[in-house]
């Protein structure tokens, strides 16, 4: 009887562990419904960004952060910043989408020193289009690759301390070993 209880506890622990590691993330190819990113946006610094032109010149990757206070999201930006050399090989450019005021979002940019524009999605209009509203104050963390026409090519939703998604992004892009 005790062995049976122990076996069930071990099975439950394993399922619980894998649920934490992989349960908060999934990726999809955007083939079911066309979702388009806005052609122009305003950065947290107040600069207009021509996303349409960027998407024609680069592989556009949008990193969403849950909230300006999210430590895992900040860590994600630092992880990607450390790997920018790999992403430059495939001509990638980034935008960071966050809820919050321009000031709070710009502070995240300053604190992470991430060298790409940050966008404050104060009214959640972009997050809503992408299906990424987590709560009235939070956006679901995600990595989004845009096509040249600004439609969503690939999206990987979710992030946690054990599973950031940058490896999946690099695998999907397939350019880390380009010369």
What are these regions (language model features)?
Residues 75-113, 124-128:
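Structural microenvironment flanking redox-active thiols in thiol-disulfide oxidoreductases
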Residues 54-80:
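Short active-site neighborhood of thiol/selenol oxidoreductases, capturing the structured segment around
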Residues 115-116, 134-144:
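Structural micro-motif
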Residues 3-13:
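Bacterial N-terminal signal peptides that target proteins for export
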């Amino acid at each position: 009887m005790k062995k049976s209880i122990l076996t069930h506890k071990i099975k439950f622990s394993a399922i619980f562990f894998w649920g934490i590691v992989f349960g908060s993330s999934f990726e999809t190819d955007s083939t079911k419904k066309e979702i388009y990113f806005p052609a122009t946006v305003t950065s947290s610094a107040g600069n207009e960004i021509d996303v349409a032109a960027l998407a024609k010149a680069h592989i556009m990757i949008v990193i969403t952060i849950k909230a300006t206070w999210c430590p895992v999201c900040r860590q994600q930006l630092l992880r990607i910043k450390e790997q920018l050399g790999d992403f430059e090989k495939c001509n990638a450019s980034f935008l960071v989408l966050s809820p919050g005021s321009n000031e709070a979002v710009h502070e995240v940019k300053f604190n992470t020193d991430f060298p790409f524009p940050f966008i404050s999605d104060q009214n959640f209009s972009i997050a809503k289009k992408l299906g990424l509203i987590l709560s009235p104050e939070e956006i679901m963390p995600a990595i989004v690759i845009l096509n040249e026409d600004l439609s969503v090519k690939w999206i990987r939703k979710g992030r946690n301390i054990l599973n950031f998604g940058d490896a999946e992004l690099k695998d999907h892009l397939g350019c880390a070993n380009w010369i």
